[in-house]
Regions:
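Expand to "…catalyze enediolate/carbanion chemistry for C-C bond making/breaking, isomerization
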Residues: 2, 6, 13, 42, ...
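Flexible active-site lid/hinge loop adjacent to a nucleotide/diphosphate
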Residues: 176-205
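Generic C-terminal helix-cap and adjacent flexible tail
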Residues: 322-330
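Nucleotide-state-sensitive switch-loop elements of NTP-binding domains
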Residues: 2-13, 17-62, 68-157, 164-171, ...
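Alpha-helical scaffold elements adjacent to nucleotide-binding pockets in ATP/GTP-utilizing enzyme cores
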Residues: 98, 135, 160, 164, ...
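Generic beta-sheet signal
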Residues: 85, 171, 196-197, 235
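Long, well-ordered amphipathic alpha-helical subdomains in the mid-to-C-terminal portions
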Residues: 19-21, 234, 245-323
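Canonical P-loop GTPase G-domain recognition
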Residues: 193, 199-256
Length: 330
């Protein structure tokens, strides 16, 4: 087994094999790995925090993997070291990591200045979020100065990612009629920059029109006194056009946050939110593994299914039993 000093030294020196092993360690849900993982993160924390953290989401069919491949390759060409992480709670259903996106990022996958990590399988959105947050610490300590966090799954994954990044990029497509069609409710409110992808060939003009219309809608949504109104740009990941402007707007947004003290405040609040998220996740883990709860739960679930007991009363009885359990928690 690799000791703490070897992990810390390997990560700080950017040794890919040890960086990968370190991320596997912090992703692990095994009890025997938890103590070492937290010691490692504590040692790496002072060496993290300097990267530009960008969340990326997109409507179905937007070409997100192609965009990240082109965007990340542009950044490594500019001298940056890029890490790509994914938040995909749906991957736990199949019991394996999402590898498809990594194989579609053909340039980044072989770029020595890039590190692409598929989504961990942690069983819950909270588990995946924890693993991704801790992976950010590892990647930053390894010298990656740009971290791209991709949302792959459904549900609340966009909100989870927005809670761990500095700026949030939404990728969308030119559409006939309502330009908001296909964009999940609530995601627009999270976006700091919007990019209309596939602005190439016969779709270039359509994309530019869509960008103008969406920009107007966002101005109405945010109001004239907003601290930041998300710019809407058009780009083509396939032709690598417009990507430099997307980067410029994202870095401008981050610089504005930094200059007003909001970046520090945002990251501090993210850490506090993370703390309480971990409290909820750990309480649920302890509750589910409590022997008394494991004995009682099937009985109560059966009664709830039969309509003999309300969900509220069942929950109260589970919590009562959990609170009465003697001895140390598992």
């Amino acid at each position: 087994m690799i000791d703490l000093d070897t992990y810390v030294r390997g990560v700080r020196e950017g040794k890919r094999a040890l960086v990968a092993r370190a991320i596997t360690l912090v992703e692990s849900t095994r009890p025997q790995h938890r103590a070492l993982a937290q010691e490692l993160l504590t040692a790496l924390l002072p060496h993290s925090g300097n990267a530009v953290r960008i969340g990326i989401s997109g409507v179905p069919g937007v070409g997100k993997s192609t965009f990240i491949d082109a965007f990340g390759s542009m950044l490594t060409g500019l001298g940056h070291r890029v890490a790509v992480l994914a938040v995909d709670p749906s991957s736990s259903r199949t019991g394996g990591s999402i590898l498809g996106d990594k194989t579609r990022m053909e340039r980044l996958a072989v770029d020595p200045a890039a590190f692409v990590r598929p989504s961990p399988t942690a069983g819950t959105l909270g588990g995946v979020t924890k693993a991704t947050r801790e992976s950010i610490v590892v990647m930053e300590a390894a010298g990656h100065d740009v971290v791209l966090v991709e949302t792959v799954g459904v549900g609340q994954s966009e909100t989870a990612v927005a809670g761990m990044v500095d700026s949030f990029l939404l990728l969308t497509l030119a559409r006939t009629g309502d330009q908001l069609q296909g964009i999940k409710k609530g995601v627009l409110e999270l976006a700091d920059v919007v990019a209309v992808n596939k602005a190439d060939g016969p779709h270039e003009r359509e994309a530019r029109v869509a960008a103008r219309e969406l920009a107007g809608a966002l101005r109405l949504m945010h109001g004239a006194d907003a601290f930041w109104t998300p710019p809407v740009l058009s780009c083509s990941a396939r032709e690598s056009t417009g990507l430099d402007e997307v980067w410029e707007r994202l870095t401008h947004h981050r610089a504005l946050l930094d200059g007003t003290g909001q970046l520090t405040a945002r990251r501090q609040e993210q850490q506090v939110d993370w703390t309480w998220s971990m409290v909820r996740e750990e309480l649920l883990r302890r509750l589910r593994t409590d022997p008394a709860v494991k004995d009682l739960a099937p009985v109560l679930e059966k009664r709830v299914r039969a309509g003999e007991l309300t969900a509220t009363l069942a929950a109260e009885r589970i919590l009562d039993v959990f609170g009465e359990s003697p001895g140390p928690r598992p």
